[in-house]
Amino acid sequence: MKNIHKNASLIVLWAALIILSITRGYSIPPKRVIKLGFIPLTDCAPLVIAKEMGFFAKYGVDVQLSKEASWAVVRDKILNGELDGAHCLFSMPFSVYTGIGGKSGSEMKIAMILSNNGQAITLSKDFCGLVGFRDLKKVAAAVKSVRAHKEVTFAMTFPGGTHDIWLRNWLAACGVNSKSVGIITIPPPQMVANMKVDNMEGFCVGEPWNGVAATQGIGFTQISSQDIWKNHPEKALVVNKAFSETDKEDLKNVMKALIEACRWLDVMGNRKKAALLLSKPNYVNAPVQVIEARLMGSTDIGCDLGVQKYKDDYMLFYNNGIVNTPKISYGIWFMAQYMRFGMLNTAPNYNEVAKKLIMSDLFEEVAKSMNVPVQEDMKPFKTNIETIVFDPKNPAAYIAGAKK
């Protein structure tokens, strides 16, 4: 009986405290809103799907998506805390940390990879008839021919970003030194408009903007990024340092929701719906037919060059778990490219920087809880358009032998 009275007294006291807190203007703090940025590109799909299909809500996180104008804006907002994280170029944190794309030493953390493949290099109509689809042998002569009557300029989306590196790798494989042409930075959604007014002769960007250029007759797809390196790392979930260190439970739940979205996206029957959602003005704001076609692996090349069908290396988001592991070796590879192309004068401490910026332990924890196989790392690998093997344990040997 005494215990019953004691429990009743505690309940009354608890209720009184709640009433007192409300009357004094106090309230239970609301759940924190997590703000994630994205650039209007087809591969922002994991964030859009996690939001639209309720995966963020399923894992108990209140996520607000923020459409951003450029990768530079994304960088600044992650670093100053306006964004907790974003759909980001995988190599951006390395570019920023090494001082190529931002203030040296600035830390942006990579939590997981969101996508492979699905980017391309588009050439203007000036190159129509001079070079065909995936024809690398004729590019140098075509550049020389166009250069006879105008300066040849190529655009990418962020210094040291993935598109910058795909462009430089393509130029090198074609026998064109990247220092012999102009390379400028243009935000992804502005690429087509800039080519239309003749601001550049080619660009490297993510979809759907290559597809839009081809369907509008402004340019044609010369090569897709998966032809440069099949199943390459492309976009990642990149977060600010504070979010990665002080709010790990929320971050883990964001990652779980994104993994579920990535799985959903790799069911091909879902891609039509994904394209429809992405095409909305508040997301990518591009023709649904163009988004859908390239999501399904169908590339209308443009310039009367026909259609290329990709069967197993179109844009991938999960691929039985192969996509999502953020490998240390990938970070080392991108930093090796910076040295290869003279973007850095002094070699960084490759392992130290990669391990500092990639949250391998956190990803492994989340992956195991979601039954995602963590991929083996630090093994040598080779891209499609190079003959030289990259050994992440010896980047200097690769740099010495790679075409510049």
Annotate each predicted stretch with a short phrase.
Residues 1-31, 375-377, 381-388, 392-404:
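Short, low-complexity disordered leader/linker segments with a strong preference
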Residues 28-184, 197-213, 218-231, 383, ...:
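Short, glycine-/small- and polar/acidic-enriched structural segments
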Residues 41, 68-72, 87, 158-162, ...:
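Soluble non-cytosolic domains of exported or imported proteins
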Residues 121-122, 236-239, 243-244:
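Short glycine- and hydrophobic/aromatic-rich loop-to-beta-strand nucleating segment
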Residues 246-359:
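Secondary-structure end/capping motifs
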Residues 332-404:
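Conserved C-terminal helix/tail region of periplasmic/extracytoplasmic solute-binding proteins
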